[in-house]
Swiss-Prot record:
CDD domains: ACT_ACR-UUR-like_2, ACT_UUR-like_1, HDc, NT_GlnE_GlnD_like
Source organism (scientific name): Mesorhizobium japonicum (strain LMG 29417 / CECT 9101 / MAFF 303099) (Mesorhizobium loti (strain MAFF 303099))
Gene name of this polypeptide: glnD
Keywords (A to Z) from UniProt: Hydrolase, Magnesium, Multifunctional enzyme, Nitrogen fixation, Nucleotidyltransferase, Repeat, Transferase
Cofactor(s) listed in the protein's UniProt record: Mg(2+)
Lineage of the organism: Bacteria, Pseudomonadati, Pseudomonadota, Alphaproteobacteria, Hyphomicrobiales
Full protein name: Bifunctional uridylyltransferase/uridylyl-removing enzyme
Database matches in SMART domains: HDc
C-alpha cells in the first residue's frame, strides 16, 4: 500500500515549544518552579496539544491514513513529553552536578511504545532508573505526571530500575509485553539500551513457548468479554474478535517468538506471503482509521462502534449509498470483511507456529501441551490425515489435485468429530481460486455440502468454519454477497451471514430437543417433517440470502432458491418448497405479532397463504429459527405463545375443524357456559353479571379467564370500588397480565399505556372490552422482568397501583413519563419513515389501523390518545417492536360500532396519526373537528 506522508513538522515544533517554555522563566532567572511558571507551561502545553490534535484530525479526513494518524498523534505526544522532561530537569529541579544515580530514561511502553496512539489512548510511561529512586528522580517524575494529568491525559506509569523490570517481567505477562514494545523517548539512552539487551537475553530467549500460550489464552478471554462473534453489529474495534488487538497479538508473538522487530521480517521468516502481509497492513490501517475517527467524534476513548456514530464515520471515510445498501451499511460490510481478514491472518499465523521452520526454535515443542505430533491415517481417504486429533492435509497438492477435496475436508471433519489443523485451513484459504462453475455444479461436491448442512453433529460450527475460510461464499456466490453484510438496525445483532448460520444452529437444537422447553411445539413437529428435512435446512440457510438488494428480499430470495436448489440435488418438489418458505418466511411472524388472532379473518387470510398443514409446520419451525437467530433477548415466551396460537387456529381451519356455527349461536352458547360456571352465585347476581358482557368478550376470552374476571368484578363491587386492578403472571409466556376495571372513557387505553411507560412496563398486547353498565374491563400484557413469580407479581402490583393513581388523578402522567423514561441509546440516528394505514379487508367486524415509525417513550400513549380524539373505539391493540422500529396494530370501530369506510374520514385519521408519529402536536379543536368528519 502507498506510503502516506506523515508531515510531522506541521503538527508541532518541539524546539519552538522549548523556547516558549523557557521564555516563561525569564523573569525568575531560569527558575520554573513557581506557580506562575507552572500555570504558563500548562496553558502552553494545552494549546499545543489541542492544535496538534486538530491538525491530525484534519489530516485524517484528508488522506484517510489510519496508521499515519496514530503515528502523528504519537509524535505529538513524544514532543510534548520530551519538552516537559527538559523543562523539569533544566528549570524546575536543577542539579548542577548530578550523581550517577541521578539519571533517568523516559520510555514509552505498551501501545504508546509501538509509536501509535488514538486520540483517547492511555499514555503508558516507564521512568527507568539505574539504581534506587533519588529525591531528584522522584520530584521530576511527580512534576511530569501531574502536568500530564492536568492536561487531561490518562497516564499509566511505573518507576523502576533495570533489575526490577526484568524480575517483574519474568512473572507478569502484561509487564513483559509492555517492555517488548518499549521505545526510547528521552533522557539517558544507555539505560534503555541496557534494559532491552538484558530483556532479550535473560527473558525473551528462554520463554517463547510460555509467552505464546499466555497471549493466545489472553486473546480468547478478551473475545469472550468483548463479544465472541466477529460479526456483532456494534463491534469493539480495539478488543473485539477481528479487531486491532488481534493484529497486535500476532505481532507481539511474532516479535517474541521469531525475535523480529518489524512486520516485514515475518515475511522473510516465511510466516506470511507478501500478499498476506499487505492484507495485514491494510487491515491495520483501516482499523486505526476507524478507531481514531471514533475517538475524535466522541471526544473520548470510545472503543465500541455504536450505531449512533456509525453513520458519521461512514461519511468521514467517504462511503456513499448504492442501490440496496446505504453508505453506513457499505462501511460496516467493509469493517466485517476486514475483521474476517484478521481471522484469516490469525489462522495462517497459528499454522506457521506449527510449521517446520518453527521447530528449530528452542522449546517450540512445548508451545502446546499436547504438541508431540501424533499422525495417523484417516479412514476412507488418502488425502487427509489426523494430526494430533485434528484433520490435516496429507500434502500440499490435495486441493489442486481434486478441488472437491475443499468440501471433503469439512465432510470428514464432521463425520469424525475433528477440529481443523491450521495448516489445512491455511492451504484452503490460499486455494479458494479453485472454486469455479465446474465445482459449483459438481454432483459430489453438492452432495457433500448438503450432508454438511444437514448433519446431526455440528452443522453450525462447520458452516461457520467454511464461511470464515471464505469457502461458503465462493461455493454459493449469492451467499458471498451477504457475507459481512450488516443491517443498520438495533433489532439485528449480527451480520446477515452470521444470522443465517446461527439459524441453522437453532434448527439443529430444535431437532435434537435441546430447547424443548423453549419451543415444545416445533420440537414435537420435527419427527413428522423427515421427508422435507433437507428442504427445511436449505430454506433456513437461504431465507435472507437476497438481503441488500433493491427489490423485496423475500421475492428475490425465492428466485435465487429456485436457481440454486436443483444444483444442490434437491427434487423439483423440494425446490418449490424451499422457494415458498423463503418467499413467505416473514408471514407467520408478522401475522402472529401484528394481527388479532381471535379474529377469524386473520386465520382465514393466513390459511390462504400456507394452504397445507405440511407447509404450516415447516413455516412455524423456520419462523422460530429466524427469530431465535436474530440475537439474545429477541425471542421470548410471548412470541412463542403467539406463534403456537396462530399454528393451532390455522391447523384447525385447514383440517376442517373450524366451526361454521353462526356468531349469534356461538355467543348464546358462550353466555350459557358462563352462567353454568357461576352456578354457585345467587340467580339475580348471575343473570345480571352474564348480561353485562357483549358478544366480543364472550367469544374472545377463555372461560377460565372469564371466571377470574367475574370474581374480580364481584369483589370490586362488594368493596364499592369503581377502579381496581388485578395481576396474573405467565412464566412460560414471559408476560404479565394486568386487568383494569374502570369507568369507560375515550382515552382510557392511552392513560393506561402512559402509566405503564412511567412504571417501566412494556406493553405487548391489549384487549379492550366494555360492559353494558358503562365500565371498561381492559386486559394488557407487559413483558416479564423478573424470573421469580413472587418478584414479578410485586412489580406488576406496583404497575397496577400506578395505573390506579393516574386514573384517579393522584399522579400526573406527563411528568411521570418524562421522569421515568429516556430514549434508547442510538435510536435518534435511525430514520424510520412513518407509516399509517387503515384497512377494511383484514377483519369482518373492525377497521384495522397499522402504524409504523421510530419508537420513543410514550408513543403508544400518544397514538391511542390520538385514536380516542378521533372518536374511534379500540377493540384490541397489538404492539411489536423491532429494535428502534415499532409496528402497532389497532382493531377499531366508530362510536356506533361500524367500520370506518368514508375516504375523507380515513384520510383524516391517517393524517393525524402521521402527525403523531412525527411528533407534531394536534391543532386546537382537533377532536371536535375529527368527530364531525
Amino acid at each position: 500500500m502507498a506510503k502516506i506522508s506523515l508531515k510531522l513538522d506541521e503538527l508541532i515544533d518541539g524546539e519552538a515549544l522549548r523556547r516558549e517554555m523557557t521564555a516563561l522563566t525569564t523573569a525568575t532567572a531560569g527558575d520554573g518552579s513557581g506557580a506562575a511558571a507552572r500555570a504558563g507551561v500548562l496553558q502552553l502545553l494545552k494549546a499545543r496539544l489541542a492544535e496538534g490534535r486538530k491538525i491530525a484530525e484534519a489530516m485524517l479526513k484528508e488522506d484517510g491514513g489510519g496508521n499515519a494518524c496514530a503515528e502523528r498523534l504519537s509524535h505529538l505526544m513524544d514532543e510534548l513529553i520530551r519538552a516537559l522532561y527538559d523543562f523539569a530537569a533544566t528549570h524546575v529541579y536543577r542539579v548542577k552536578n548530578r550523581s550517577s544515580a541521578e539519571r533517568m530514561a523516559v520510555v514509552a511502553v505498551g501501545g504508546y511504545g509501538r509509536g501509535t496512539l488514538a486520540p483517547g489512548s492511555d499514555i503508558d510511561l516507564l521512568f527507568l532508573l539505574p539504581y534506587k529512586q533519588t529525591p531528584w528522580g522522584e520530584q521530576t517524575v511527580e512534576y511530569m505526571l501531574y502536568m500530564l494529568w492536568d492536561l487531561g491525559l490518562k497516564v499509566g506509569h511505573a518507576t523502576r530500575n533495570i533489575d526490577e523490570c526484568l524480575r517483574l517481567s519474568r512473572t507478569d505477562i502484561t509487564i513483559r509485553t509492555s517492555i517488548l514494545e518499549a521505545r526510547f523517548l528521552w533522557g539517558e539512552r544507555k539505560l534503555y539500551d541496557e534494559l532491552m539487551l538484558r530483556f532479550d537475553h535473560e527473558v525473551v530467549r528462554t520463554t517463547g513457548p510460555e509467552y505464546v500460550q499466555a497471549k493466545l489464552a489472553e486473546r480468547d478471554e478478551r473475545h469472550a468479554k468483548a463479544g465472541e462473534s466477529r460479526y456483532l453489529v456494534e463491534p469493539n474495534v480495539k478488543d473485539g474478535k477481528g479487531g486491532l488487538r488481534d493484529l497486535q497479538t500476532l505481532f507481539w508473538i511474532g516479535k517474541y517468538f521469531y525475535r523480529v522487530r518489524t512486520g516485514e521480517e515475518l515475511v522473510e521468516k516465511g510466516v506470511f506471503t507478501e500478499a498476506e502481509y499487505r492484507e495485514f497492513q491494510k487491515a491495520e490501517d483501516f482499523l486505526w482509521a476507524v478507531r481514531c475517527h471514533m475517538h475524535f467524534l466522541t471526544g473520548k476513548a470510545e472503543e465500541r462502534l455504536h450505531f449512533d456514530i456509525q453513520r458519521e464515520i461512514a461519511e468521514r471515510l467517504g462511503y456513499t449509498t448504492h442501490p440496496g445498501l446505504s453508505a453506513v451499511e457499505r462501511f460496516m460490510k467493509h469493517y466485517f470483511l476486514v475483521a474476517k481478514d484478521v481471522g484469516d491472518l490469525t489462522r495462517i499465523f497459528c499454522a506457521a507456529l506449527e510449521e517446520e521452520q518453527a521447530k528449530h526454535v528452542p522449546g517450540f515443542n512445548r508451545i502446546f501441551l499436547t504438541f508431540q505430533r501424533r499422525k495417523r491415517k484417516l479412514a476412507g481417504t488418502s488425502d487427509f490425515i489426523v494430526d494430533n486429533h485434528r484433520i490435516n492435509i496429507a500434502d500440499d497438492q490435495v486441493f489442486e489435485r481434486d478441488p472437491v477435496n475443499l468440501l471433503r475436508l469439512f465432510w470428514f471433519a464432521d463425520k469424525h468429530g475433528l477440529e481443523f489443523h491450521p495448516d489445512a485451513l491455511k492451504l484452503l484459504t490460499r486455494s479458494l481460486g479453485l472454486v469455479n462453475k465446474s465445482l459449483r455444479r459438481d454432483e459430489e461436491a453438492n452432495r457433500l455440502f448438503l450432508d454438511i448442512l444437514t448433519s446431526d453433529r455440528n452443522a453450525e460450527l462447520n458452516l461457520r468454519r467454511m464461511n470464515e475460510a471464505g469457502l461458503l461464499g465462493r461455493l454459493i456466490p449469492d451467499f458471498g454477497k451477504i457475507v459481512a453484510m450488516m443491517q443498520f438496525s438495533m433489532y439485528h445483532h449480527y451480520t446477515v451471514d452470521e444470522h443465517l448460520i446461527r439459524c441453522i444452529g437453532v434448527l439443529a437444537e430444535i431437532e435434537r430437543g435441546d430447547g424443548e422447553k423453549v419451543h415444545p411445539l416445533s420440537h414435537s413437529l420435527m419427527p413428522g417433517l423427515k421427508k422435507s428435512r433437507e428442504a427445511l435446512y436449505v430454506a433456513v440457510l437461504l431465507h435472507d440470502i437476497a438481503k441488500g438488494r433493491p427489490e423485496d428480499h423475500s421475492e428475490a430470495g425465492a428466485r435465487i432458491a429456485r436457481r440454486i436448489c436443483p444444483h444442490m440435488g434437491l427434487s423439483a418438489a423440494d425446490t418449490e418448497t424451499v422457494a415458498w418458505l423463503v418467499e413467505n418466511h416473514l408471514a407467520m411472524s408478522m401475522t402472529a405479532q401484528t394481527r388479532d388472532l381471535n379474529d377469524r379473518k386473520t386465520i382465514e387470510d393466513f390459511a390462504s397463504i400456507v394452504q397445507s398443514v405440511e407447509r404450516l409446520k415447516l413455516l412455524l419451525v423456520l419462523t422460530v429459527c429466524d427469530i431465535r437467530g436474530v440475537g439474545p433477548g429477541v425471542w421470548n415466551g410471548w412470541k412463542g405463545q403467539l406463534l403456537r396460537t396462530l399454528y393451532y387456529e390455522t391447523e384447525l381451519l385447514l383440517t376442517g375443524g373450524f366451526s361454521e356455527v353462526s356468531r349469534a349461536q356461538r355467543t348464546a352458547a358462550a353466555r350459557e357456559r358462563l352462567a353454568e360456571a357461576l352456578a354457585d352465585w345467587p340467580d339475580k347476581d348471575r343473570k345480571r353479571y352474564v348480561g353485562l358482557h357483549y358478544e366480543n368478550y364472550l367469544l374472545t376470552v377463555d372461560l377460565p379467564d372469564q371466571l377470574r374476571h367475574a370474581e374480580f368484578v364481584r369483589e370490586a363491587d362488594a368493596a364499592g370500588k369503581k377502579l381496581a386492578t388485578m395481576v396474573k403472571t405467565h412464566q412460560f409466556e414471559a408476560v404479565t397480565e394486568i386487568t383494569v376495571l374502570a369507568q369507560d372513557h375515550p382515552r382510557l387505553l392511552s392513560v393506561i399505556a402512559g402509566a405503564c411507560v412511567g412504571a417501566g412496563g412494556n406493553i405487548v398486547d391489549a384487549q379492550i372490552f366494555t360492559t353494558a353498565d358503562g365500565r371498561a374491563l381492559d386486559t394488557i400484557l407487559i413483558s416479564r422482568e423478573f424470573d421469580r413469580d413472587e418478584d414479578e407479581r410485586r412489580r406488576a402490583e406496583r404497575v397496577g397501583r400506578l395505573i390506579e393513581d393516574v386514573l384517579s388523578g393522584k399522579s400526573w402522567l406527563p411528568e411521570m413519563i418524562e421522569k421515568r423514561t429516556k430514549p434508547k441509546r442510538g435510536a435518534k440516528v435511525f430514520k424510520i419513515p412513518p407509516r399509517a394505514e387503515i384497512r377494511n379487508t383484514l377483519s369482518n367486524r373492525f377497521s384495522v389501523i397499522e402504524v409504523e415509525g421510530l419508537d420513543r417513550p410514550g408513543l403508544l400513549s400518544e397514538i391511542t390518545g390520538t385514536l380516542s380524539d378521533l372518536s374511534l373505539d379500540i377493540a384490541s391493540a397489538h404492539i411489536t417492536t423491532f429494535g428502534e422500529k415499532v409496528i402497532d396494530t389497532f382493531y377499531v370501530t366508530d362510536l356506533t360500532g361500524q367500520k370506518i369506510d368514508s375516504p375523507a374520514r380515513i384520510a383524516t385519521i391517517r393524517n393525524r396519526l402521521m402527525a403523531t408519529l412525527e411528533g407534531i402536536a394536534p391543532e386546537r379543536g382537533g377532536k371536535a373537528k375529527a368527530a364531525a368528519e
